[in-house]
Amino acid sequence: MQDEDGYITLNIKTRKPALISVGSASSSWWRVMALILLILCVGMVVGLVALGIWSVMQRNYLQGENENRTGTLQQLAKRFCQYVVKQSELKGTFKGHKCSPCDTNWRYYGDSCYGFFRHNLTWEESKQYCTDMNATLLKIDNRNIVEYIKARTHLIRWVGLSRQKSNEVWKWEDGSVISENMFEFLEDGKGNMNCAYFHNGKMHPTFCENKHYLMCERKAGMTKVDQLP
């Protein structure tokens, strides 16, 4: 462009530089970082949960294995202890054994302790006598018990078998009825014989007011493994 004096004037417009949106870039960066942190946190939580589940499963497994070993050890210990007790009985020197969970003068067999007492008592008195020792009158519910008791006493002894009336069924103290063919039951047809005693492998009904010796039974505890010979 030429001015009045003949000089050429250049009209140059300076371009303004584009402004960078600092706020927008900063916001995007924080979002990325927040997403990364969220993913890391979720991953840590999932990892901790998985670790916790694995830890519980491992503990349960080890506990189960330990219980199985303990149960197996107890079974072996029980059998061996009862073998030792039986041998002492066969030798006629029965004094019990330290491995037995039963008290002195109680016999250890199966899962129970058996007490043979020479006290002349009525059936009700015998029942109370056993109760006072945290036991019950003997219940015979399998053939092994029949043979075990038969081999260890030849005396008349009360057991926990009775009935309310002569026309009612015989029941054990826990309310269960006698099993068929478990033992020979000698019924003589006389009325009011509502209590039973055991003698030489057979069950006999008799009057509850009669006085006889008795047999008590209670659950055995754990075999004392550390006392085995």
Swiss-Prot record:
Changing D188A: Significant reduction in rhodocytin binding. Expressed preferentially in the liver. Also expressed in immune cells of myeloid origin and on the surface of platelets. One of its GO terms (cellular component) is plasma membrane. Residues 55-229 are extracellular. Glycosylated. A motif (ITAM) lies at residues 7-10. CDD domains: CLECT_NK_receptors_like. The chain crosses the membrane at residues 34-54. Glycans are attached at N68, N120, N134. GO terms for biological process: cell surface receptor signaling pathway; defense response; platelet formation; signal transduction. Keywords: Disulfide bond, Glycoprotein, Host-virus interaction, Lectin, Membrane, Phosphoprotein, Receptor, Signal-anchor, Transmembrane, Transmembrane helix. The keyword Cell membrane does not apply. Residues 1-33 are cytoplasmic. Gene3D superfamilies: Mannose-Binding Protein A, subunit A. Residues 109-217 form the C-type lectin domain. Disulfide bonds join C102-C113, C130-C216, C195-C208. Homodimer. Interacts (via cytoplasmic domain) with RACK1; promotes CLEC1B ubiquitination and proteasome-mediated degradation. Interacts (dimer) with SYK (via SH2 domains). Interacts with PDPN; the interaction is independent of CLEC1B glycosylation and activates CLEC1B. C-type lectin-like receptor that functions as a platelet receptor for the lymphatic endothelial marker, PDPN. After ligand activation, signals via sequential activation of SRC and SYK tyrosine kinases leading to activation of PLCG2. This is C-type lectin domain family 1 member B. It comes from Homo sapiens (Human). The gene is CLEC1B.
